């Protein structure tokens, strides 16, 4: 009996990611330096770890409510109010999730139906499309490569009008993976002026909100589009807590009343001990990202200088911890082939730009969430490779 033909047909649209394919292609290279990971190289702050230990010792190992601990929702409410001037009631406008990924899954499965369209500025994080596809909806990419990876009001409105009534949502990720771009208040207000004219959800993936390098705090669209915005955030990037799997949904009460249904039946509730640690992270550790940011800026600037001198075109990223660089003219523009050859010859791994959609081809993404020692050696090997190619 072969039951594989009875799986959800939408799974046929989902393939193993190019990131995983590339990782497999270089997996047998000994001692490869990986500037590939989308997670901080820092460790979770000690005081946060101690809070989790206390919770374990106090037998705080039972289910919490579906929305999460009230103390954590209050801490999250206070945190986003102080940092980003967002106003969400901890009683009924905040859901604690198993990372930002579950927050996205719960949100997109709740708002989308078969045949719906979702706009996404591209190049983009590849994790959105599989979720959208699973419910029978479709991602429509907006090419931003000719505008410094920034979505303009004109580009947005044109795309909205082209999709018509089938458009259900717009996803905005900023600071962005893979490009590192972010938006000023003025840019966001211009986008908000367009979005509020249309009955669409605005899903804001703001998981890198604590990692901005302009000297200004992150600005959330939730301050401008409260009746449309669903804000996704988490602690993975801000507090080096990727493995703790702790995220949040911030949305109006009439939204969370629906979103909690998909959240509940996906996971029941987030990890209890991790929630206690998160309370500590958002209170005593509310500024824990600051020392990390200083390190990231030094690493970013070093890489930009080295790669620019080698002919790569780079839009300076103002957030996250990625460089998205255009492969110089005269070299193989097939990003997978270019980086596979580089990895096999010099034992350094970046991520092919093609992993981030059709508009990422011809680019490479590297993460500066790695030590300066590794980064210096990687840049030295890249210089050798470019000279020898």
Where are the regions that the model predicts?
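PLP-dependent class I/II
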Residues: 1-7, 12-15, 20, 25-33, ...
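Conserved N-terminal alpha-helix of the aminotransferase class I/II PLP-enzyme fold
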Residues: 64-98
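A short acidic, glycine-rich active-site loop
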Residues: 59-63
């Amino acid at each position: 009996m072969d039951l594989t033909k009875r799986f959800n047909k939408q799974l046929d649209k989902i393939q193993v990611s190019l990131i995983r394919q590339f990782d497999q292609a270089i997996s047998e290279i000994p001692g490869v330096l990986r500037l590939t990971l989308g997670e901080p190289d820092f460790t979770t702050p000690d005081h946060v770890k101690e809070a989790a230990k206390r919770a374990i010792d106090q037998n705080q190992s039972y289910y919490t409510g579906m929305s999460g601990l009230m103390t954590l929702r209050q801490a999250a409410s206070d945190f986003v109010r102080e940092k980003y001037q967002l106003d969400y009631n901890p009683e009924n406008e905040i859901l604690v999730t198993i990372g930002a990924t579950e927050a996205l899954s719960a949100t997109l499965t709740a708002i989308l139906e078969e045949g719906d369209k979702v706009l996404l500025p591209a190049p983009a994080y590849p994790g959105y499309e599989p979720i959208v596809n699973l419910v029978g909806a479709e991602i429509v990419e907006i090419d931003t490569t000719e505008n410094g990876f920034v979505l303009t009001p004109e580009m947005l409105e044109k795309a909205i009008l082209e999709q018509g009534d089938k458009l259900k949502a717009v996803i905005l990720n900023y600071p962005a993976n893979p490009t590192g771009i972010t938006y000023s208040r003025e840019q966001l207000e211009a986008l908000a002026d367009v979005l509020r004219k249309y009955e669409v959800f605005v899903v804001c993936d703001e998981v890198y909100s604590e990692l901005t390098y302009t000297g200004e705090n992150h600005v959330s669209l939730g301050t401008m589009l409260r009746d449309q915005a669903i804000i996704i955030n988490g602690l993975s990037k801000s507090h080096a807590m990727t493995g703790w799997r702790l995220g949040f949904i911030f949305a109006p009460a009439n939204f969370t009343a629906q979103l909690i249904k998909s959240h509940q039946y996906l996971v029941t509730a987030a990890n209890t001990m991790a929630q206690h640690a998160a309370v500590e992270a958002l209170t005593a550790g509310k500024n824990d990202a600051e020392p990390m940011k200083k390190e990231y800026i030094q690493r970013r600037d070093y890489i930009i200088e080295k790669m620019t001198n080698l002919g790569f075109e780079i839009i300076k990223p103002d957030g996250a911890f990625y460089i998205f660089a255009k492969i110089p003219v005269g070299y193989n523009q097939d990003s997978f082939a270019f980086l596979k050859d580089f990895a096999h010859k010099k034992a350094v791994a970046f991520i092919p730009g093609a992993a981030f959609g059709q508009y990422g081809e011809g680019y490479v993404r590297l993460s500066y969430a790695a030590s300066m020692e590794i980064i210096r050696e990687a840049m030295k090997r890249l210089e050798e490779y470019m000279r020898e190619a």
